């Protein structure tokens, strides 16, 4: 079986070759923690890392409100235009799918491995941005449900 260090080095190389600084940096930080005997922080990082990442993502998205680049005048069209209503629906659907993804991960936690590898493939080969393992799980849950509906017919 491949050791954690080797896997992290492989991820660093994949990140560098694929021009994905996020993967390379994340794997590098984990490798440093592992090599400096700070592995005791892994459970905390695993448990709280996603929350912290989402917190910073949300902060970055809300900066235009705080800096007053977006005003109430800009928010009103959300409720009166097709684009605005579609954005609201998209947000609601994404949130619902995240919930389905969480349900899937709770019932089948081993799927996280496929989601991580799929995310790496998406980052490296499709220039994707890894913002949501829950969304990836939600999409997986949706596709599995479609498979269940149409595959059984």
From Swiss-Prot:
It is found in: Cell membrane. One of its GO terms (cellular component) is plasma membrane. The chain crosses the membrane at residues 6-26, 52-72, 77-97, 111-131, 132-152. InterPro entries: UPF0756_TM. Keywords: Cell membrane, Membrane, Transmembrane, Transmembrane helix. It is a multi-pass membrane protein. Belongs to the UPF0756 family. This is UPF0756 membrane protein BBR47_23170. The lineage of its organism: Bacteria, Bacillati, Bacillota, Bacilli, Bacillales.
């Amino acid at each position: 079986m491949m050791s954690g260090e080797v896997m992290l080095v492989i991820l660093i190389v994949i990140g560098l070759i694929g021009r994905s600084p996020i993967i390379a940096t994340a794997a590098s930080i984990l490798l440093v923690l592992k090599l400096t005997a700070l592995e005791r922080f892994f459970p905390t990082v695993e448990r709280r890392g996603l929350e912290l990442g989402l917190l910073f993502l949300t902060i970055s998205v809300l900066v235009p409100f705080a800096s007053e680049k977006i005003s109430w005048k800009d928010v009103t069209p959300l409720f009166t235009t097709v684009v605005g209503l579609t954005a609201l629906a998209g947000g609601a659907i994404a949130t619902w799918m995240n919930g389905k993804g969480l349900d899937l991960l709770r019932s089948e936690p081993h799927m996280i491995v496929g989601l991580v590898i799929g995310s790496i493939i998406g980052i490296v080969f499709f220039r994707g941005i890894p913002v949501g393992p829950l969304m990836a799980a939600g999409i997986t849950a949706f596709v599995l449900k479609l498979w269940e509906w149409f595959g059984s017919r």
